[in-house]
Amino acid sequence: MLKTLFGDPNARKLKKFQPFVTEVNLLEEEIQKLSDEELKYKTVEFREALDKARNDEELEDILDEILPEAFAVVREAGIRVLGMRHFDVQLLGGIVLHKGQIAEMKTGEGKTLVATLPAYLNGLTGKGVHVVTVNDYLARRDAEWMGQVHRFLGLSVGLIQGGMNPEERKKNYGCDITYTTNSELGFDYLRDNMATAMAEVVQRPFNYCIIDEVDSILIDEARTPLIISGQVERPTEKYLQAAAIAAQLLKQESEDDPGDYEVDEKARNVLMTDAGFEKAEQLLNVQDLYDQDNPWAHYIFNAIKAKELFTKDVNYMIRNNEIVIVDEFTGRVLPGRRWSDGLHQAIEAKEGVEIQRETQTLATITYQNFFLLYPKLSGMTGTAKTEETELEKVYNLQVTIIPTNRISRRYDLPDVVYKTEDAKWQAVAGEVEELHHQGRPILVGTTSVEKSEVLSKLLQQKKIHHNLLNARPENVERESEIVAQAGRKGAVTIATNMAGRGTDIILGGNADYMARLKIREYLMPQIVMPEDDDLMAGVSGNGGRRPQGFGTSKKKGKNWSPSDADIFPTKMSQETEEILKEAVKFAVEQYGQQSLTELEAEEKIAIASENAPTDDSVVEKLRVVYKAIRKTYETVTDQEHDEVVELGGLHVIGTERHESRRIDNQLRGRAGRQGDPGSTKFFLSLEDNLLRIFGGDRVAGLMNAFRVEEDMPIESQMLTRSLEGAQKKVETFYYDTRKQVFEYDEVMNNQRRAIYAERRRVLEGLDLKEQVLQYAEKTMDEIVDAYVNPELPPEEWDIPNLVGKVKEFVYLLKDVTPQDMEDMTVSEMKIFLHEEVRKAYDIKEYEVDQIRPGLMREAERFFILQQIDTLWREHLQTMDALRESIGLRGYGQQDPLIEYKQEGYEMFLEMMIDIRRNVVYSLFQFQPQGQPQTV
């Protein structure tokens, strides 16, 4: 109703941006006539225009003025370098991103190409643009692929990958446009704020950021804070004992059942009953689980959580005798990440693997607060409209839906629901068998490694050849190979949580990728250094995904052939094979036998498969071969493409509704890309987690009401409504959790900003003497206020103890006596001590600088940073403890958040006072050795 009255707000926004698009189109012909040199010179002209800006506001105005011409230049560069022309809808997406909004674009609409427009425009300012993706592989792919456009136009392109050293990071962050992942970016920020010298700081001040898969980073990952931690000693036997006790405690199955503990699956928490406490205390032979000298409660709670809420092959996997976390949203393993607060150790104890040391938080920030540090933020995703309210409230980001370039021909079939999970899997296998015989490609999405293997076994029994894509290492290695052929005729692919996978499924198969793979097979063994294989192990990052044409690390001696020889649609002709061997031989002559790193070799293949101008003769030869191989393969894939389209395109099967409708939509979005036909269907059961946890009693009632056979699907409007209701409930529940995390973290965030700003001032400050003197004067004032009450008569003032305390802090004031201060007022005392402490500091400085000139300046910086870091670490722990206990205030009719803000603020002020006092004390106590020493 409102839409018809006021018009669609989304359409209004698009209408406002349309004139820009028209202008870009009008400039196209003129820009086409420019030579490569003239096109590149446009960058210089734009930069000269931007140099005239006197402030940030003027800079934004000039960017808006040059936008149409800059976009027209990027569009032309895209055609010349990549052979890709930005559609009008992609230009619209670029404008939305430049305006600091979220562009919602469907899968297959070329989001990666869209980002080149605002990245180039904002990169012209020289202040740095960060393009953020969800993993190392996508960052590398985009930097090498899209980066060619920027490099061609004269902008520098940087790439941040796991395993890079600080020098490389600094150099790459210094570029005009830097491609990176959200976690690398966040951890570099935290590390920069732990640096002990400016030379160690790798990032510049933040300017503009474009987040790919923005919903996955700002919403799915918002609940998980980034944490840098140091190790602390904790007794491992306590974890083992707690695991043994948790195994003996019984879960409460119903209200009347006594049980030892309740499990709240919704809040992912456990609550022990009185009987449980008693039983645990008896088994441990202790009086009280909360005894301060020998606390057990924390260990027991974690052990029960590990037993009830964390399932092997769903939440984690065991790899090389270690517990590795599986990301619940992407189905990928997260090597190196650990659950905090002793939970990881509890799971290690449960599974009987080696228990690693517990950690203490040194620095932490949530993605929510991290990305709010950017003055201008934007993002792209296929699905954001469902979370629009949250994106607007928390991040102040508007969502604009960009129309698709071609009309979608995807057909979403109604859900079918089975009574039991077994019946559901049988039905899925039946559907796959039927469509597979017709020759349609099928993609089945599952929610965990375990479930994908259940289906895989059923298909093996039916003798249906299929590919499995989940977090197991042997499958991760082949990810891009599997996706490249997922659209071929009759292909069956089972994928775990395929959200944000970055590689499109092309009907008929991806000839382009297969041609690159063929070149890799011949070229890599000849030109890649064998010893690089180990070095690269750290670089592949998140789960070692293999990108399109950019490989991951190899174990020594592993061959470069694809793991599935049938991947190639047809054999190469003898003639093509000869040219390929010639090109490889030529590459060896030019570069030397096994002389390149794997990354360098991958980059050569990547450039060979694009149209970027190159002066490398090897790349030119490889390009000729690449085109020949691709042409051979296309004779098969093009024909298959037409056959598959005729059959109805890719069929996507969902096997469980995800907690978030958005992830379901991402899976559906794999079918019907760029106007191709396709269909989707969800198979569910009344035993699925979502229905079990959030569907509640209504569904249980329905189960009994439907007296149907196990293998009969239930189709009912009421059930579909229950499902959507359950999903909305979950989304609201998680939104509230995130909002709460955000509100509480906001308190920490203000404190973090203050402490990091102080720290940065110290790092950059050339002369910290004045700062230390102010610390000293404030400390003197505090001592006076502590011992002198102006409301009492002067004869009752405790001046002897006041003087004693002053000498305790500053031994150089040993000559000050109570008599010196007898007849002074409070303010006179303070002025007197200010003068004395300044004199004492000059003496101290003279003594220290006798050892080595300038040593006092170094000591000042060292002690201030040391105190900030040590006390901030302790403060993080006390704030954590406060946060955990504050929830109970709700029972006392107080608002826990207000209490947390109040007490947190008081604790922060105390910490700042402690930092000041400790610095003053440490500097006056500082006794450098006779030898020159570095502090």
Curated annotation (Swiss-Prot):
GO terms for cellular component: cell envelope Sec protein transport complex; cytosol; plasma membrane-derived thylakoid membrane. GO terms for molecular function: ATP binding; protein-exporting ATPase activity. Pfam families: P-loop_SecA, SecA_DEAD, SecA_PP_bind, SecA_SW. It is an enzyme of class 7 (translocase). GO terms for biological process: intracellular protein transmembrane transport; protein import; protein targeting; protein transport by the Sec complex. InterPro entries: Helicase_ATP-bd, Helicase_C-like, P-loop_NTPase, SecA, SecA_CS, SecA_DEAD, SecA_motor_DEAD, SecA_preprotein_X-link_dom. It is a peripheral membrane protein. ATP binds at Q90, G108, E109, G110, K111, T112, D504. Its EC number is 7.4.2.8. Residues 543-568 are annotated as: Disordered. It catalyses: ATP + H2O + cellular proteinSide 1 = ADP + phosphate + cellular proteinSide 2. Part of the Sec protein translocase complex. Interacts with the SecYEG preprotein conducting channel. Has a central role in coupling the hydrolysis of ATP to the transfer of proteins into and across the cell membrane, serving as an ATP-driven molecular motor driving the stepwise translocation of polypeptide chains across the membrane. Monomer and homodimer. Part of the essential Sec protein translocation apparatus which comprises SecA, SecYEG and auxiliary proteins SecDF. Other proteins may also be involved. This is Protein translocase subunit SecA. It comes from Rippkaea orientalis (strain PCC 8801 / RF-1) (Cyanothece sp. (strain PCC 8801)). The gene is secA.
